[in-house]
């Protein structure tokens, strides 16, 4: 149920919108207008009409159960792929063939692609049309920021997708061109929203429909700036000059970055009644369709990380233990007892977080390591990132943790089977100025990865971009040789429905991809050999 004293007639409008944007298997990029879409007369004033489309977008960057979508939609679109590949969440569903084994389930891959286009791109297109007609450039700018927040996750999943000329062409754009468009859009949006809030730091926009910041434009500009910094770092190996340019634009912007828990981007429980889908999947889907991944549990346990109790529950023997991805089981009961930890999530308080405050510090730490002008040094930003993550998770002081130069990731001991694993990494929490570039980068990304949990799309992207942290490989690799077990999965293949309904577009995507349409082909920004 949507809170914030929204009148019943608005609920009917949102219901009409949900029907209008119902997920379909065929996406028409040329004219994405649903004949069942709610009419202007039904929607009433422009503000209500635009707000309803915003409401749709904010609930689709990360899928939540809202009457139209279900927790199972999040499960198939994200948890069974990104969250696993990031080393965060392992699937324990009774199945002998699934995404975790690199045996891609077509309906799940379809969901990842389709939900983004029907839930983000379609409503954005409507907002863009209304805002352009009404001369509301700040509304258009806000919608564009949300669009980029959602769609970069999809581009980072598949590679080339329809984006640059969305609405006018069904062709797939090369990923480098999509990123250029991201930066163009974010730069324009930051300028427009910055001007809107200039001289009035409390300026509001779409406050009745904003489940993230309650309409605070100042906070949205910080988010947009930090998002630009995130995407700049993503292309650091593919286009170093562009990466540095965009990163320095963000850091030097007068509108600031996300630096505190109060400014982090999350679905606010005070503005929207919802629960984190992982909580439902972990506790109520067949008594638990997922558990913590062995990788992150082994890291946090071995590093004596106090955040581990905030992330996961204790096992029956008083310790912490996870599950490797890529397992093959038809007996889920092995993973539903107390031998394995569970996710420490509360249905009423655990938020869905789009961007943590800690991330901005780790991004600047890496930028400083690369010699960019980040306004500080790598060590200081690194330690600030860890401290802010501790604050965000209410894990106490980080002083002892940051001084620990001996603790390393713990060897994984399978409590159910015999799929044990010993790490080769010797990374510790304490900064070591004597480390070379790679040693410092591994430390930054390892702590960033821990702080990002459970944001699977971002964790997986950073692993592919940098090769860090060392993640435990899959137990079963069913890719028939298309995915290297040690390098791990690099992307999702294009969807069955798109190959049927938009064969020409998919062909353009494969051509731009520069490799086979399988999970082993690297994306444009994925340049490292590790």
PLM regions and their residue ranges:
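Structured, solvent-exposed acidic/aromatic patches
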Residues: 44-48, 90-398, 433-441, 447
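Short acidic (Asp/Glu) and glycine-rich catalytic loops that position anionic groups and cofactors
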Residues: 33-35, 340-342, 420-425
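C-terminal functional modules
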Residues: 390, 394-530
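Intrinsically disordered or highly flexible coil/loop and linker segments, enriched in small
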Residues: 18, 22, 66-67, 395, ...
